[in-house]
């Protein structure tokens, strides 16, 4: 299907098939679609509501046009990249939980970018903490093999996205591009935990992950609006295991937490976000420790290392409080 025909179909309030969406996005990635046509495509799709097939097709195109690793990794990989954009301004919980997971021996290929809606994105906070995020492809792959953690800076691994950049910036609203980024890790991890900015996206994302063939994956959104597991409110999540999707809720009351200070997990500026992140790594933040441990625990659950998220939380919390995670991260950045 030609790009113009795809836009006309969307304008008629019809959804594209996976192949049609993939074809259009392939043209975009090659710089063959005008800004006017791309703007029309993104706007019409947003008005219709992105379907599973459309998100899957766009994801396949982005993956196809990404740089590919030269290394064949002989181990299971996890990514904790979320959509961002929940507008809550929390500390970088998914990034910190990725560090905790790596300190526990999980191989983490963290896919990410600069800030979407928070004061600091995953790239921003890692840089502030001393980890170099913009390195060569060879270094990124070597870090994963030798250290168990690596960061894939999205603009470097998805150079074809430059063709969509000006239109995305000009439109200024969320489009399908905000969805396909977390689904397009170039290392193709078979295990993934994704926090989403709207509860309606949990079903869509888990079905896309199912179509992509992941072994185990979890998509979550908390009832207080976070794109991660919350220590203050119930978190709903969809779960994929061996091709089967199930739906669940996690109530943090089961952890027995009380008198938590929300100010320890909500940042007012980039500098404040860094201060709060360091407090977590230094075991100086009660609420921050619980929040990061809970999300790391969910990662352990996705990896199949424990039977329940609660068990994972206890293991992750001990890693933080014992200084294990701090030592791991200090060793990690000392080799930069």
Curated annotation (Swiss-Prot):
GO terms for biological process: L-tryptophan biosynthetic process. Mg(2+) 1 binds at residues 94, 228. Homodimer. GO terms for molecular function: anthranilate phosphoribosyltransferase activity; magnesium ion binding. Pathway: Amino-acid biosynthesis; L-tryptophan biosynthesis; L-tryptophan from chorismate: step 2/5. Anthranilate 2 binds at residue 168. Anthranilate 1 binds at residues 82, 113. Its EC number is 2.4.2.18. It is an enzyme of class 2 (transferase). Mg(2+) 2 binds at residues 227-228. One of its GO terms (cellular component) is cytosol. It catalyses: N-(5-phospho-beta-D-ribosyl)anthranilate + diphosphate = 5-phospho-alpha-D-ribose 1-diphosphate + anthranilate. Belongs to the anthranilate phosphoribosyltransferase family. 5-phospho-alpha-D-ribose 1-diphosphate binds at residues 82, 85-86, 90, 92-95, 110-118, 122. This is Anthranilate phosphoribosyltransferase. Catalyzes the transfer of the phosphoribosyl group of 5-phosphorylribose-1-pyrophosphate (PRPP) to anthranilate to yield N-(5'-phosphoribosyl)-anthranilate (PRA). Binds 2 magnesium ions per monomer. Keywords: Amino-acid biosynthesis, Aromatic amino acid biosynthesis, Glycosyltransferase, Magnesium, Metal-binding, Transferase, Tryptophan biosynthesis. NCBIfam families: trpD (TIGR01245). Its cofactor is Mg(2+).
